[in-house]
Amino acid sequence: MEKLWLNSMFSNGKLEHKYRLSRSMDSLGPIRYSSGSEDPVLNAMDNKVSSWNDSGSCNFSNVEHFLDIIDIWSFISDDTFLVRDSNGDSFSIYFDIENQIFEIDNDSTFINELESSFSSYLDSSSMNSGSKKSSRYYYRYMYDTQSSWNNHINSCIDSYLRYEISIDSYISGETHNYSDNYVYNFICNESISGNESRNSAIRTSVNGSDFNIRGRSNDLDINKKYRHLWVQCENCYGLNYKQFFRSRLNICEHCGYHLKMSSSERIELLIDPGTWDPLDENMVSTDPIEFHSEEEPYRDRIDSYQKKTGLTEAVQTGIGELNGIPIAIGVMDFQFMGGSMGSVVGEKITRLIEYATNKSLPVIIVCASGGARMQEGSLSLMQMAKISSALYNYQLNKKLFYVAILTSPTTGGVTASFGMLGDIIIAEPNAYIAFAGKRVIEQTLNKTVPDGSQAAEYLFQKGLFDLIVPRNLLKGVLGELFQLHGFFPLT
């Protein structure tokens, strides 16, 4: 059962009634009360909206006695948008800012039939009244040119965003041409403001991706005031509703780009619930070389990242079960000082490998790092050799199974050591994987690095790793790999 929420207000004399329309794929059921006074005329079971059939027609004859031409715009709430993307698909978008609700219904059949029914009702009501323009609620843009209608749409949406949500800055583009806007309908019951803003351009198709709200080219970040509601894709700049973003595994719903995940989110993704047992979680750095910066002392910087992320270091290690198979896993977190590898990170990963060696467990290390931590000097570089030595004993002497998962970004010392030592090396789609960054190479060698030459897809063709696996398939793929190598569930 799919539901389209239209928190609309119907006027009938002095009474107001709030409704919820519940819709299945085949029919639109009776209109039911959610609040308001009982009205026997509206509550009668015979006052139903008939089924939506293949012909696309709908009979409103049973309810026309309480709907007037002035009320048809109240059928859709002020917070509901009807839009069409560049492919011609129709969507309804519902906002409830107060309750932080954002819902999208993309069943084009329902929207098209709804639009058709409303248009038919408007035509019939206008004929009964004798003139379309006799009503003061008649929208002058309804039968105007497409250009004027598009301008009106942009004006309404711009006014809604700026006044209803109180956005301080414009969501704007640099053009006054709205001919490429795919927003085709916006139904509201407020009077049209005389001030039409021509500085906003809200597009539902940018570079082949639908429902992107494009801001100024020099300001791609979302307004800080609403970052608790939205996550902006760093690839297509589309907005993802935060409430659903985590359930989608931090994958952009517009372009499929894999955005960064925290180490805790990755543990939740890979480890069976209730089986996670962390190792060495209280190990912290003691500033071994007493590194001090004019901007911020190293210890103070460590403390600030600990408060920001809730982690003690840039890696979490522990044991758990993946589809019932006991494993040892280390997950690096780029949010903690760029996932840089210091003495504590190296020690925790080494201890994890040694524990797995003694317990004969398969090992997974999820890499997300900018490389060695410069604040610890040569001690951070030593971790590369220390981890590689532990892996040598684990893989060659004990003949156990190690899987390296490379996420974006994986660079520097991590790439040069345990990141590329896996028996199976898996990369995420679009992951940035390199030893030296693009700018470092260009400034050092004075040569241009081609775009995409450090992306997972290009490196896969060059044989740098074995698989590119999307997040939603990763756990299943790992489970099959472990069983193929002789590791089976406990039960």
UniProtKB/Swiss-Prot annotation:
Functional description taken from the UniProt entry: Component of the acetyl coenzyme A carboxylase (ACC) complex. Biotin carboxylase (BC) catalyzes the carboxylation of biotin on its carrier protein (BCCP) and then the CO(2) group is transferred by the transcarboxylase to acetyl-CoA to form malonyl-CoA.
EC numbers for this chain: 2.1.3.15
Required co-factors: Zn(2+)
Gene name, Swiss-Prot/TrEMBL: accD
Domain called CoA carboxyltransferase N-terminal: residue spans: 229-491
Top-rank lineage group of the source organism: Eukaryota
Reactions it catalyzes: N(6)-carboxybiotinyl-L-lysyl-[protein] + acetyl-CoA = N(6)-biotinyl-L-lysyl-[protein] + malonyl-CoA
Family as reported in the entry's similarity comment: Belongs to the AccD/PCCB family.
Molecular function as annotated in GO: acetyl-CoA carboxylase activity; ATP binding; carboxyl- or carbamoyltransferase activity; zinc ion binding
Gene3D superfamilies: 2-enoyl-CoA Hydratase, Chain A, domain 1
Zinc finger (C4-type): 233-255
Subunit structure, interactors included: Acetyl-CoA carboxylase is a heterohexamer composed of biotin carboxyl carrier protein, biotin carboxylase and 2 subunits each of ACCase subunit alpha and ACCase plastid-coded subunit beta (accD).
The protein's name in its UniProt record: Acetyl-coenzyme A carboxylase carboxyl transferase subunit beta, chloroplastic
A Pfam short name: Carboxyl_trans
Primary localization: plastid
Cofactor details (free text): Binds 1 zinc ion per subunit.
Taxonomic lineage: Eukaryota, Viridiplantae, Streptophyta, Embryophyta, Tracheophyta
The keyword Lipid biosynthesis appears for this protein: yes
Entry annotated with the keyword Signal: no
Cellular location(s): Plastid, Chloroplast stroma
Keywords: ATP-binding, Chloroplast, Fatty acid biosynthesis, Fatty acid metabolism, Lipid biosynthesis, Lipid metabolism, Metal-binding, Nucleotide-binding, Plastid, Transferase, Zinc, Zinc-finger
Listed GO biological process terms: fatty acid biosynthetic process; malonyl-CoA biosynthetic process
A GO cellular component annotation in the UniProt record: acetyl-CoA carboxylase complex
Residues reported in the UniProt entry to bind Zn(2+): C233, C236, C252, C255
Pathway per the UniProt entry: Lipid metabolism; malonyl-CoA biosynthesis; malonyl-CoA from acetyl-CoA: step 1/1
Signal peptide segment: none
